[in-house]
Amino acid sequence: MANNEESRGLKSLFDWFANRRKSGSTSLERQEREIADGLWHKCSKCGVLAYTKDLKANQMVCIECGHHNRVDSDERIRQLIDNNTWKPLDEHLRPTDPLEFRDRKLYSDRLRETQDKIGLIDAVRTGLGQINGLPIALGVMDFRFMGGSMGSVVGEKLTRMIEQATQRRYPVVIICTSGGARMQEGMLSLMQMAKISAALQRHKDARLLYIPVLTNPTTGGVTASFAMLGDIILAEPKATIGFAGRRVIEQTLREKLPENFQTAEDLLQHGFVDDIVPRTQLKNTLAQLIALHQPVLTPPHMVLWETMSLTSTAAE
């Protein structure tokens, strides 16, 4: 987080009003219109209204309190992947409704409405790209699509991405954010836990690196499978990470849980994650970890008699 005023920019609504007073008065209607048009973003933690352009420049981390606001998959890819290196995978895969599930509405209708609203086919985007020049396979979950729930398409896309990474000998990074398995797909969604885990085991057997990044929230079947299978497990500050929800656990145990229960900081203290990395440092941290695990180039194998011959020649 920047400390000097120059880098902080228009950090709050008070700064904006101060600037407007200097540049001349504006109507209240215009001010309200600019807020409604998305020029401002209200921090869900401290309530400060920040200029959206400045907030995006700080990767949606509140300049006032450091709260990590939720970001969509498009923004996350822009933050991590080098320009003009992103190659999406399996964009043609679409979810279906094999169980003809219905709760308050048909699952097929819910899918169509969500797809039309946010422009995504399902809750994950996968692809190949580069981080600081290093090739990786990246999966990014999107909480806007039915709470980032894991259905058949999410499982299939992640599995195919991991298999491609194994074939190409790429490290895998998955940005996790999910409420868990998608109940509308029943057992089919639960099967994705085993399928993704099996693909990750083959990736591990090939001695390749896998780093999950746990963001707010990461819960349910995602936590119980691929989110916790990394060689190095990273988390964002204050992220909620767990299996069952806090309210469910409190009702089951009939006792109040600690305030920091199921937070990234609590999991770090108990050894369930390896490090907590602020979003503004995530790209460089991933690049450093991937670079450390790149295969070391060794000279071609040389038989003993050739070594002896070279040694004796040098001595002469």
UniProtKB/Swiss-Prot annotation:
<keyword id="KW-0547">Nucleotide-binding</keyword>
<dbReference type="GO" id="GO:0009317">
    <property type="term" value="C:acetyl-CoA carboxylase complex"/>
</dbReference>
<dbReference type="InterPro" id="IPR041010">
    <property type="entry name" value="Znf-ACC"/>
</dbReference>
<feature type="binding site">
    <location>
        <position position="46"/>
    </location>
    <ligand>
        <name>Zn(2+)</name>
    </ligand>
</feature>
<dbReference type="Pfam" id="PF01039">
    <property type="entry name" value="Carboxyl_trans"/>
</dbReference>
<comment type="pathway">
    <text>Lipid metabolism; malonyl-CoA biosynthesis; malonyl-CoA from acetyl-CoA: step 1/1.</text>
</comment>
<dbReference type="GO" id="GO:0006633">
    <property type="term" value="P:fatty acid biosynthetic process"/>
</dbReference>
<keyword id="KW-0808">Transferase</keyword>
<keyword id="KW-0275">Fatty acid biosynthesis</keyword>
<dbReference type="GO" id="GO:0016743">
    <property type="term" value="F:carboxyl- or carbamoyltransferase activity"/>
</dbReference>
<dbReference type="InterPro" id="IPR034733">
    <property type="entry name" value="AcCoA_carboxyl_beta"/>
</dbReference>
<keyword id="KW-0276">Fatty acid metabolism</keyword>
<feature type="binding site">
    <location>
        <position position="62"/>
    </location>
    <ligand>
        <name>Zn(2+)</name>
    </ligand>
</feature>
<dbReference type="InterPro" id="IPR011762">
    <property type="entry name" value="COA_CT_N"/>
</dbReference>
<dbReference type="GO" id="GO:0003989">
    <property type="term" value="F:acetyl-CoA carboxylase activity"/>
</dbReference>
<comment type="similarity">
    <text>Belongs to the AccD/PCCB family.</text>
</comment>
<comment type="subunit">
    <text>Acetyl-CoA carboxylase is a heterohexamer composed of biotin carboxyl carrier protein (AccB), biotin carboxylase (AccC) and two subunits each of ACCase subunit alpha (AccA) and ACCase subunit beta (AccD).</text>
</comment>
<dbReference type="GO" id="GO:0008270">
    <property type="term" value="F:zinc ion binding"/>
</dbReference>
<feature type="binding site">
    <location>
        <position position="43"/>
    </location>
    <ligand>
        <name>Zn(2+)</name>
    </ligand>
</feature>
<keyword id="KW-0963">Cytoplasm</keyword>
<keyword id="KW-0067">ATP-binding</keyword>
<keyword id="KW-0862">Zinc</keyword>
<comment type="function">
    <text>Component of the acetyl coenzyme A carboxylase (ACC) complex. Biotin carboxylase (BC) catalyzes the carboxylation of biotin on its carrier protein (BCCP) and then the CO(2) group is transferred by the transcarboxylase to acetyl-CoA to form malonyl-CoA.</text>
</comment>
<feature type="zinc finger region" description="C4-type">
    <location>
        <begin position="43"/>
        <end position="65"/>
    </location>
</feature>
<keyword id="KW-0479">Metal-binding</keyword>
<protein>
    <recommendedName>
        <fullName>Acetyl-coenzyme A carboxylase carboxyl transferase subunit beta</fullName>
        <ecNumber>2.1.3.15</ecNumber>
    </recommendedName>
</protein>
<dbReference type="GO" id="GO:2001295">
    <property type="term" value="P:malonyl-CoA biosynthetic process"/>
</dbReference>
<dbReference type="GO" id="GO:0005524">
    <property type="term" value="F:ATP binding"/>
</dbReference>
<feature type="domain" description="CoA carboxyltransferase N-terminal">
    <location>
        <begin position="39"/>
        <end position="308"/>
    </location>
</feature>
<keyword id="KW-0443">Lipid metabolism</keyword>
<dbReference type="Pfam" id="PF17848">
    <property type="entry name" value="Zn_ribbon_ACC"/>
</dbReference>
<keyword id="KW-0863">Zinc-finger</keyword>
<feature type="binding site">
    <location>
        <position position="65"/>
    </location>
    <ligand>
        <name>Zn(2+)</name>
    </ligand>
</feature>
<dbReference type="InterPro" id="IPR029045">
    <property type="entry name" value="ClpP/crotonase-like_dom_sf"/>
</dbReference>
<dbReference type="InterPro" id="IPR000438">
    <property type="entry name" value="Acetyl_CoA_COase_Trfase_b_su"/>
</dbReference>
<keyword id="KW-0444">Lipid biosynthesis</keyword>
